């Protein structure tokens, strides 16, 4: 369990851990890690919007903001190890780990330490810790192909990915790849963005008729 070397349930002790397992991930139909992040109960204020008008330099990237304390206050681990931060910065200038760099098909589960853990991990874990556990022991081959369509407009997500793994001696070798092709959707196709006027510059520049 994240934050402890002692075996026990996810609710043992004063710092409970929320776990999103592989079965839940598949039930969500998640195409990116951002889709999983939205289901973390204490996530608040992360910049996971694919809209270029609202996301700025973080378009296509994913991050976690536990309890709304800032991206730099949430520690992101991959298999219990720290990861490098993204080249882009958030709208407030803070740095973060791009979790969308992890293929969904390679993810075993997500462990979220929902309370501050600065005493264990340092000041960058003031809000908590998110640990992405990969399918390191996977053997065989798995391929996924899916298509999702938005309720509004004509936007579609086409996803393809694979994972292969083999065991050689005492070592496991796993290779995973995932690609998401998301078609654009104009603001005019969404009713709340197209009320009483129209604009090609996004909702911020909506023009109202006289």
Question: Which residue ranges define each predicted feature?
Answer:
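Conserved catalytic motifs of the protein kinase core domain
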Residues: 73
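Surface-exposed beta-strand-turn/loop segments characteristic
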Residues: 35-41, 45-61, 69, 81-210
